[in-house]
Amino acid sequence: MKNNWIDVLDESLVKDFYNNQTSEEQQEGLNTTLSFGTAGIRGKFGLGEGRLNKFTVSKVALGFAHYLTSSIAHPVVVIHYDTRHLSPEFAQIIANILASHDIKVYLADTYRTTPDLSFAVRYLQADAGVMITASHNPKDYNGIKVYGEDGAQLSTDASAQLSTYIDKLGHPLHINVPSLTTEQQSLIHSVPSEVREDYFKNVQDLVGTIPQSDLKVVFTSLHGTSVPIVPDILSSLNFNQFELVASQCEPDSDFSSVASANPEDHKAFDQSIELANLIDADLLIGTDPDADRLGIVERDAEGNIYYYNGNQIGALLLNYRIKQTEGLPNRIMFQSIVSGGLAKSLAQYHNVNFKEVLTGFKYIAAEIRHLSPEQNFIFGYEESYGFLARPFVRDKDAIQIVPLMIKYAAELKNEGRMLKDELEDITRNVGNFNDKLFSHTFEGTQGKAKIENIMTQFRSETPTEMCGLKVIAIEDFETGKKTDLQNDEVSDITLPKANVIKIYFNEGFIALRPSGTEPKIKLYVSLSCDHFDVIAQKINDAIFNS
């Protein structure tokens, strides 16, 4: 097939990316196949079935059209896209193919956030949504995420059904994409302005009034979609004591000012810190390119800088939501199985119901969907900096969290306190959990095999002791079994199966899982113990250097 792909290089939309790849990278694209998984599809630009290009995107769109029309008489779909290379082009391709199958499409007229998409699906009562994004991946990546009528990413079963429709189509170069009739072209509409207006109202209702204070905020969109929506929302809440990092708040598909447009990466805040030092700011906030995740940094009066990980931000936000919802009965919060122990302990301390779900915010969305009328959702989060305070969106939503965090910090500022002080109070009450994420990248087909080998070996050689910590239980989410080593009992795990292993100690847990969206395997360590950094590093070395 290689010659066929070379023949279409000029019309593939990815010529420059392909020409800049090594011969090994080019071959990988031609010899592999991108699959539509539980998190959609994500990959590098290039030629071949293993890359994103005009033809592979068209195949996904055509399979999606067949999937929708197989069960829905007159489907309606909302399509949004981020600031990445080819995001608008891919969105238009998908819109055209859906319209050619008589599917009504609402297509954003400019870049939009992922939470915007989730909200729009719900507001417009659409049957599905599509978000063109690769989150914080490098500049030569993009992706397609598909959402159901509830505004959440497709369930595992629905993703599998869609994947079947896509796979049935065969080779991307052999697919006939029909031209649009004039009538079909009229099926593509702009997203109405009232959608965003109603989203604003929901955020305003969540946040209420931000108190007058001396709080100064620095904000960066890391070249993504959260500007102008964040400044607009803050202004609508009468909060104007913020400065944008100008060099990072313009759309830039190359993410030129950062090595990684990821708010988990401390270096992503370097320019924010420079600006904060200039204007004597207190709170620094950054969102990832599609604005579903955010990170925060705090600066004290002496200019000292404090970074917060996802579990600490999650605990702070949960603490604030507990205060906000005081007196509300049957409160419940959700977090992923690899998120740390601090928020869980805080929920238990305040008698808030708590449940863990698989990694992936769609599992939190599914729990929200199935809540009884008597239950009151107050918070959901993943340690990877994804948070949700109120479920008018059914995915991670950095946009609703930004003003909420600012309000929290403003109230504390008026008390002469910082988020740092609040976190110290929380740990004093419920225990100090230290968290660390080790992320190992293994590219290509060899890397994929290495990740599989690491998981296989870890399963077959599960220890009874690690670095002086006694193993008390093991959960293997792939087999769906939990082994209690203290009582010598095996029980069923009630969550869906997933390629995750979690090992418990009296001091906390570790978890090992391959990423669903990147060529990485991740080790999560959450322990309440002395010499945490040393022990965490030893555990990492034992798994990856053995």
Curated annotation (Swiss-Prot):
Which PANTHER family does the record match to this protein? PHOSPHOGLUCOMUTASE 2B-RELATED, PHOSPHOMANNOMUTASE 45A
For the ligand (Mg(2+)), the binding residues are 135, 288, 290, 292
Q: Gene name on record? A: pgcA
The pathway noted for it is: Glycolipid metabolism; diglucosyl-diacylglycerol biosynthesis
Q: How is the cofactor bound?
A: Binds 1 Mg(2+) ion per subunit.
Q: Enumerate the cofactors the protein uses.
A: Mg(2+)
Q: Name one GO biological process term.
A: purine ribonucleoside salvage
Source organism: Staphylococcus epidermidis (strain ATCC 35984 / DSM 28319 / BCRC 17069 / CCUG 31568 / BM 3577 / RP62A)
Q: What is its EC number?
A: 5.4.2.2
In its keyword annotation, does this UniProt entry include Phosphoprotein?
Answer: yes
Q: Which family does it belong to?
A: Belongs to the phosphohexose mutase family.
Q: Which UniProt keywords apply?
A: Carbohydrate metabolism, Glucose metabolism, Isomerase, Magnesium, Metal-binding, Phosphoprotein
Checking CDD domains in the record gives: PGM2
Q: What does this protein do?
A: Catalyzes the interconversion between glucose-6-phosphate and alpha-glucose-1-phosphate. This is the first step in the biosynthesis of diglucosyl-diacylglycerol (Glc2-DAG), i.e. a glycolipid found in the membrane, which is also used as a membrane anchor for lipoteichoic acid (LTA).
- Classify the source by domain of life: Bacteria
Q: Name one GO molecular function term.
A: phosphoglucomutase activity
Q: What is this protein called?
A: Phosphoglucomutase
Name the catalysed reactions.
alpha-D-glucose 1-phosphate = alpha-D-glucose 6-phosphate
Active-site positions on this chain: 135 (phosphoserine intermediate)
